[in-house]
């Protein structure tokens, strides 16, 4: 838990965030005086990329070693998914979900209710034994769907591990985003693990990245980036000739490439997530 006392460098894509009065998380350079919870990795990035100064209020630290087994597991799953994607095997989506659960399960919030299904014959007896914990019930056909309050007293998670995973994933993005800004390369949109930038600058950024970090930016391995557009029939580079961004995870790219005969082909890359239905 820290209090930010100084921000030395403002960024187009700020690293730290605060919650507004309405509960919306806002990434901002205007965080002087803000009190926030932060882990070691995110704090190092805030110092390195935005030159922040801070006061430590309180916190936890671990000094008895570090279990890195997850590194081997994620490497195995990544290699397996890469192989399945090459074979166009839809099972790769299952591996993707398993990989996502590496952090999702560690920061799982308490599950406050559970749904129990009972037949008409079982319903009255179940209610009589569990009435103190019944939140609601609804009859569907010949069965009852009962929402039961679940005790959270036994709930636990590994939030300190999940935070570390998320912060390392953000560092991968932070290294690229801040380097692009420092080299006056335009990043038009950023998501969790991707970004939109000018096609002619795609070759410039990797060179600067290798010079600074002594690693390859472009490739198909973990922590590397590559052009990720898909267009049926494309035999050349795929790029967007026009894009419209409405909000986070709400955008469309007009894609263009050439087919095997050299003819220009086009298609759409559309994302529309987190839009309320009412």
Language-model segments: which ranges?
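Conserved acidic
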Residues: 1-278
């Amino acid at each position: 838990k820290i209090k930010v006392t100084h921000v030395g460098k403002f960024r187009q894509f700020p690293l730290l965030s605060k919650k507004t009065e309405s509960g919306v998380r806002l990434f901002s350079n205007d965080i002087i005086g803000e009190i926030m919870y932060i882990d070691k990795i995110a704090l190092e990035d805030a110092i390195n990329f935005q030159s922040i100064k801070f006061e430590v209020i309180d916190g936890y630290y671990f000094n008895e070693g570090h279990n890195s087994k997850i590194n081997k597991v994620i490497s195995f799953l990544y290699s397996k998914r890469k192989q399945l994607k090459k074979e166009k095997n839809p099972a790769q989506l299952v591996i993707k979900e398993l990989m996502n659960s590496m952090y999702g399960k560690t920061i799982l919030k308490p599950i406050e209710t559970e749904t129990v299904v009972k037949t008409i014959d079982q319903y009255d007896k179940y209610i009589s034994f569990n009435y103190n914990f019944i939140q609601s019930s609804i009859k569907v056909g010949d069965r009852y769907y009962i929402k039961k309050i679940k005790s959270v007293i036994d709930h636990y998670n590994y939030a300190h591990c999940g935070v570390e995973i998320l912060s390392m994933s953000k560092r991968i993005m932070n290294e690229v985003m801040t380097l692009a800004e420092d080299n006056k390369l335009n990043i038009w949109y950023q998501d969790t693990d991707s970004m939109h930038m000018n096609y002619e600058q795609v070759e410039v950024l990797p060179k600067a990245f290798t010079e600074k970090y002594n690693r390859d930016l472009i490739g198909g391995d973990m922590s590397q980036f590559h052009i990720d557009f898909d267009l049926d029939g494309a035999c050349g580079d795929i790029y967007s000739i026009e894009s419209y961004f409405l909000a986070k995870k709400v955008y469309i790219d007009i894609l263009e490439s050439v087919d095997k005969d050299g003819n220009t082909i086009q298609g759409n890359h559309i994302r529309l997530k987190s839009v309320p239905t009412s």
